[in-house]
């Protein structure tokens, strides 16, 4: 966001920049939208949620700087080739729980990423794609799919980076009893 911030006034000029945050569940969408709203509102950044339960008009979408949405809803929005005025302004696509690429929702996330990359290549207009996950054992594969430059654009934090230590234990059971 700093790229679009006026250093003198602190105001944000986000008329040419939109951010999309994709979260897997409506509850997480609502939680993240509220969190972002409380943090970004002082800078004049408009955050809205867009799910199957919450609708936005075209005018509301145009006024929104950060859309927090589900994969299915963003898939529908970004697939519409008749109205690309909003999707062409997306400069940052954040996919939370990106490990779900290997789940039932994987094809929807793949379509979103592929569409974003294709649009980027067609318009020669860069979009930063960020994947977030707390459990991603094969992060190199996901990085390759997201076309991350692993020399400078891949950030991987091991468990010792956690602010509070994680204790792991393995408990062996020799016998199971039915309840």
Question: Where are the regions a protein language model picked out?
Answer:
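Conserved P-loop/Walker A NTP-binding site and adjacent catalytic elements of P-loop NTPases
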Residues: 1-178
